[in-house]
């Protein structure tokens, strides 16, 4: 191996910064890059010039959309940072970054505590077993309250928050931070950019409170660490090293979550947070090994971090860069890879050549000769690789577990302003869909209309905006449409018989299929229960294919039919006239016939909506929820406001942002995420069928 790795694996940290929108996540990342020497000038998000928000729309909207990957060094450790979006439409970006991280920093707004989107990203991080530390940011803000933030972690996330610091002052009087582990205080010079601070003994007026809090911290650690428990009960001294070891052990085991205080905007506490990343978050060696499948034998294999193993990596993001073209971001789980070498895309079974390898710093890039185990880098030259694909050594193919992406819930028709733009628009949409698996673009073969689908209105706005900026395609978009589905609600059996025997080669296919509703989300399940060859083996795949194709067009209003179990149990064939095509048609006829007795319904996406408004607007807002066919699931008082939890059909939520803004004089906010599908009321079902020129039988 020609190149030597700069940082050993145990001194590598792959972390994400996750938060609710506006908690100060991008500013926090920005400061990390500033203090680790990657940025010379600090850019403020609210001035629209942040280092990490590298797409033009992100700078305009002041929100982070694309997870940019950045590398920094701190105290002889390499820290790879993935900046994740806080807006609910982009939870797919959060999911995909969590998949490749080892640890995360959850940023809270110290005045608001845990907010709805914090809960969403926290739940996603828990699904992937990602250890976290929490940074209570904006301690300088009016109403900032560190203890309230800690309590909100216990109450709203049911997580064992461990405060390892205590702020000195708050709001305008936020002067510094006491480290409860080392019992030292960091006091900041008000005028400096936070690069100037002094570490002193805990000031006398804070000693008693700090001692009390340190004791509480040790008591909490004793609950999960026997060594601390014994020493604590025996009244023995517990060293700083022992406390740090216990915090690290508890954090890695997801038994506790250290909480720190600071103000990224005022440059306070970021360095101590970086120390905590190094001290408490895992290296690639600390996380449980990822599993992969050997495609030849089907055996499960554990991926062990180490440069001496065969190369295995996951492509977790594809982005188009204006200067170098298509970038594929990869996380290396084991082995090394040199630029110019070949890899096998085990997902697609294709060999690809890696032209160059880049380490990304926000939107700057540095070419590197080789990537090592545990690294995150971007590869140029991979033409067939898309998000979620496994890249491995051609001599040792391995299939990593792919990522699961949600289906889009909202769609709009999009049309180029001029006919000349049609081809350009098709290319742009294809590239954008490659980058973002939660976005789809399809052309209706009958009407020629192009429809784009995504996770929310903002998601699609940004896609249209990117078409204009990056691909110079001007497009107009129609009104948003809901992605409805159809389902059977009763068990039934039906025959599908397709016979054509007049002149020339005939056609003959005959099937009996039993249909029943499947559990929500289980999809289509096909069972072959043919006995005695009444339908020959070679035609059975055609029956399944015929059913799948017919389900795509539904039975009521042309929406996909979902969650159906189909059992092929009888039928007949003709020695000469039967063919795969005939059985395919017969299967679709069986589905149509079944629709008459299976009581089909139209399903609509139901969103989980959380609305936060000052108390005086509660009545009006509750009325709005009910008027939108919503059902209120609960309410709670949070930080001087009321939060309403409700389930509302997506079709009723279009344009709600404007309604809420005017009803609450701009003081209300809401988030919504897709929750489940449920049947629409009968009257609405009839309207939908009528509107679609429905073909209910």
From Swiss-Prot:
One of its GO terms (cellular component) is cytoplasm. Keywords: Cytoplasm, Elongation factor, GTP-binding, Nucleotide-binding, Protein biosynthesis. InterPro entries: EFG_II, EFG_III, EFG_III/V, EFG_IV, EFG_V, EFG_V-like, EFTu-like_2, G_TR_CS. SUPFAM superfamilies: EF-G C-terminal domain-like, P-loop containing nucleoside triphosphate hydrolases, Ribosomal protein S5 domain 2-like, Translation proteins. Pfam families: EFG_C, EFG_III, EFG_IV, GTP_EFTU, GTP_EFTU_D2. GTP binds at residues 19-26, 83-87, 137-140. Residues 10-285 form the tr-type G domain. Gene3D superfamilies: 3.30.230.10, 3.30.70.240, Elongation Factor G (Translational Gtpase), domain 3 (3.30.70.870), P-loop containing nucleotide triphosphate hydrolases (3.40.50.300), Translation factors (2.40.30.10). One of its GO terms (biological process) is ribosome disassembly. It comes from the Bacteria. One of its GO terms (molecular function) is GTPase activity. It is found in: Cytoplasm. Belongs to the TRAFAC class translation factor GTPase superfamily. Classic translation factor GTPase family. EF-G/EF-2 subfamily. NCBIfam families: EF-G, PRK12740.1-3, PRK12740.1-5, small_GTP. Catalyzes the GTP-dependent ribosomal translocation step during translation elongation. During this step, the ribosome changes from the pre-translocational (PRE) to the post-translocational (POST) state as the newly formed A-site-bound peptidyl-tRNA and P-site-bound deacylated tRNA move to the P and E sites, respectively. Catalyzes the coordinated movement of the two tRNA molecules, the mRNA and conformational changes in the ribosome. This is Elongation factor G. It comes from Pediococcus pentosaceus (strain ATCC 25745 / CCUG 21536 / LMG 10740 / 183-1w).
């Amino acid at each position: 191996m020609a190149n030597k790795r700069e940082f050993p694996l145990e001194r590598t940290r792959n972390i994400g910064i996750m938060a609710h929108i506006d908690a100060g996540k991008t500013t926090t990342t920005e400061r990390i890059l500033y203090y680790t020497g990657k940025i010379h000038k600090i850019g403020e998000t609210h001035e629209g010039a942040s280092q990490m928000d590298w797409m033009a729309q992100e700078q305009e909207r002041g929100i982070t959309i694309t997870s940019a990957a950045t590398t920094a060094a701190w105290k002889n450790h390499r820290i790879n940072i993935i900046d994740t979006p806080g807006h609910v439409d982009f939870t797919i970006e959060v999911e995909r970054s969590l998949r490749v991280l080892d640890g995360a920093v959850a940023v809270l707004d110290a005045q608001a505590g845990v907010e709805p989107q914090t809960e969403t990203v926290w739940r996603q991080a828990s699904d992937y077993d990602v250890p976290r530390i929490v940074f209570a940011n904006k301690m300088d803000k009016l109403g900032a309250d560190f203890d309230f933030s800690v309590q909100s972690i216990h109450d709203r996330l049911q997580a064992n928050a461990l405060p390892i610091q205590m702020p000195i002052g708050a709001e305008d009087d936020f002067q510094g931070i006491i480290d409860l582990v080392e019992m030292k205080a960091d006091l900041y010079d008000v005028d400096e950019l936070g690069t100037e601070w002094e570490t002193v003994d805990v000031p006398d007026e804070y000693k008693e409170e700090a001692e009390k809090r340190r004791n509480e911290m040790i008591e909490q650690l004793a609950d999960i660490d026997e060594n601390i428990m014994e020493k604590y009960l025996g009244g023995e001294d517990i060293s700083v090293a022992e406390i740090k070891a216990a915090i690290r052990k508890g954090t890695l085991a997801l038994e506790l979550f250290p909480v720190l205080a600071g103000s990224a905007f005022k440059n306070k506490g970021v360095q101590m947070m970086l120390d905590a990343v190094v001290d408490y978050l895992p290296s690639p060696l600390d996380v449980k090994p990822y599993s992969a499948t050997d495609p030849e034998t089907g055996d499960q294999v554990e991926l062990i971090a180490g440069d001496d193993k065969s190369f295995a990596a996951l492509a977790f993001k594809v982005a188009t860069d204006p200067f170098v073209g298509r970038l594929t971001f990869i996380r290396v789980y084991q082995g090394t890879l040199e630029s110019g070498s070949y890899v096998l895309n085990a997902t697609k079974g294709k060999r690809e050549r890696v032209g160059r390898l880049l380490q990304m710093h926000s939107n700057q890039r540095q070419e590197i000769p080789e990537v090592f185990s545990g690294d995150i880098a971007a590869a140029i030259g991979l033409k067939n690789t898309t998000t979620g694909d496994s890249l491995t050594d051609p001599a040792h193919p391995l299939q990593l577990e792919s990522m699961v992406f949600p289906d889009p819930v909202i769609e709009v028709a999009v049309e180029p302003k001029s006919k000349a733009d049609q081809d350009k628009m098709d290319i742009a949409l294809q590239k954008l869909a490659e980058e973002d698996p939660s976005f789809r673009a399809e052309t209706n073969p009958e009407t020629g209309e192009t429809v784009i689908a995504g996770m929310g209105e903002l998601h699609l706005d940004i896609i249209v905006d990117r078409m204009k900026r990056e691909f110079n395609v001007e497009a107009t978009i129609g009104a948003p449409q809901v992605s409805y589905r159809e389902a059977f609600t009763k068990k039934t059996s039906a025959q599908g018989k397709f016979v054509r025997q007049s002149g020339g080669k005939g056609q003959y296919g005959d099937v009996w299929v039993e249909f029943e509703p499947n559990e929500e989300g289980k999809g289509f399940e096909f069972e072959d229960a043919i006995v005695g060859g009444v339908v020959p083996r070679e035609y059975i795949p055609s029956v399944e294919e015929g059913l799948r194709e017919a389900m795509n067009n539904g039975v009521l209003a042309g929406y996909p039919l979902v969650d159906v179990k189909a059992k092929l149990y009888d039928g007949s064939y003709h020695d000469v006239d039967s063919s795969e095509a005939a059985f395919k048609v017969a299967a679709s006829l069986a589905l149509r016939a079944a629709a008459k007795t299976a009581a089909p319904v139209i399903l609509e996406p139901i969103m989980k909506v959380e609305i936060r408004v000052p108390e005086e607007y509660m009545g009006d807002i509750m009325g709005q929820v009910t008027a939108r066919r919503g059902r209120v699931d609960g309410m709670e008082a949070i930080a001087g406001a009321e939060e309403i939890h409700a389930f509302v059909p997506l079709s009723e939520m279009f344009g709600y942002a404007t309604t809420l803004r005017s009803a609450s004089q701009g003081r209300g906010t809401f988030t919504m995420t897709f929750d489940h599908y449920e049947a629409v009321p009968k009257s609405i079902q009839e309207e939908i069928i009528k509107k679609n020129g429905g073909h209910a039988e």
